[in-house]
Amino acid sequence: NEPTEWKLVFPKKFPFDKDVKNLTDKIEKYLKDSNAVLLKSSDDIYSVSDNFIVIHGFSSKESANSVLSVLKEHKNYKIKDQAYIISTEDYKIVQMKKKFEEWLLLNK
């Protein structure tokens, strides 16, 4: 069964520092600049000490990857944060079962 939707996930330690504000500002700027109406971002709680900054709404892994490239390389964003592309289906399991570490090992 092929995934139908993908997300970009930026794992972050909680409570947040100014780097996270910087990341979320750049994501919001990108969403506004690109007029990406199908994409939205959120701050999702994962555990007491970890949260995910997430961009939702990609129709393919490739489109998520292409946005990640823009965020990393374009002069207006230049993000350095570690990010992962995950299917919505996998993300639900990761969140319900708190299995992000296991998911990382399976998706290197």
Model-identified regions with their sequence ranges:
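Acidic/polar low-complexity segments and flexible, solvent-exposed patches
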Residues: 1-108
